A protein has these predicted regions:
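Short, solvent-exposed loop/turn segments at the edges of extracellular beta-sandwich modules
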Residues: 134-138
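Short, compositionally biased P/S/T/A/G/V-rich stretches that sit at domain boundaries
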Residues: 1-16, 29, 34-35
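Short amphipathic, basic-aromatic surface patches that mediate peripheral association
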Residues: 28-60
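Residue-level recognition of secondary-structure-to-loop junctions
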Residues: 109, 115-123
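Extracellular Ig-like/FN3 beta-sandwich strand-entry sites
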Residues: 21, 112, 124-126
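Solvent-exposed loop segments of extracellular immunoglobulin-like
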Residues: 62-69
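C-terminal edge beta-strand
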Residues: 140-148
Length: 150
């Protein structure tokens, strides 16, 4: 397994206005390891039983699968990402959109390897956004700066 590579497309310093969406395109290259375990044929009844089952391990287990997540590294206000981003930290709640959550499934990988996300800012200021490509075993980060005006 080698780390996936996340490369932000476009300028590393961008400008926008409050309320206007910025398109964040990121190319992700990965070797396909570790292998993703996708159980998409699970029935609703089996899913309900799995949700109610007590943990079987004392340590938190991360679900393997390539994903990309954008987050705010520094900034004054709230940033809304669309689609909503998986959390790159341990959040074990079932519906937390985190690889450590019991029912989380990795999102589909775009055919061309380029993930498209929009970011909308609610306050002016300078924001540093970071993106993480994570395959469940290793990860790679990239950063951009966005200057937001009124």
């Amino acid at each position: 397994n080698i780390p996936p590579i996340a490369t932000s497309q476009g300028d590393n310093i961008r400008s926008t206005r409050v309320g206007e969406a910025v398109i964040l395109s990121t190319q992700v290259i990965d070797d396909g390891l570790p292998v993703t375990r996708r159980d998409q044929t699970i029935t609703e009844d089996a899913l309900r039983r799995r949700m109610m089952r007590p943990p079987s391990k004392l340590t938190v287990q991360k679900i393997n699968g390539l994903f990309l997540a954008w987050n705010v590294y520094r900034g004054e206000g709230k940033v809304t990402f669309d689609p909503p981003m998986p959390k790159p930290w341990e959040d074990t709640r079932t519906a937390a959109n985190s690889p450590w959550g019991a029912l989380w499934l990795p999102p589909e990988i775009p055919e061309d390897g380029i993930y498209e996300v929009t970011a909308t800012f609610d306050e002016p200021g300078t924001y540093i956004l970071w993106t993480r490509a994570d395959d469940g075993g290793l990860y790679h980060d990239d950063y951009i700066t966005v200057n937001v005006t009124e």
